[in-house]
Amino acid sequence: VFAGLVLIGSIALFSGKKLDNEKIMKRYYKVYEPPTSQRSAQSGMDADFTLALEFYNTRDYEKAAILFNKVLESKPNDMQTVLLKGVSNFEEKKYPEAKQSFGEVIDDKDNLYIDQAQWYLALCYLNTNEKEKAKQIFNVIGKEGGIYQNEAKKIIRGLK
């Protein structure tokens, strides 16, 4: 009987931690919506980007990531495409690839997508049970401001 109670207690303890992360994801996660103004399809790269966006918008994230990757071969510094590739990989639960993309956007330091990259990177860390790394990024978001500041502050309070 004691062993059974210990087992049940252990399961509750470990699943409780995971459930907290799941609650956070359920409450605060929304897939990134790219700006509605799309590039004109004048070149092959823009046609690939437009098709990748179509896959992304229809939630075919695997095909979207492949095409975003193709776009990045000829335009590696396009941070919007890097972010979209990251979110596509995030949706496919390919967290190492997603983390790499979000880190690249953040490290670039000169683009309009840093807020989103920080947010999704922190969520990646939650999904891979790297709670301390997630907290660090949520703290940065909470202090620096930006579009996710309020959500980050609420999550920090919930993680303590």
PLM region descriptions:
Residues 1-24:
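Single-pass transmembrane signal-anchor helices and their membrane-water interface zones
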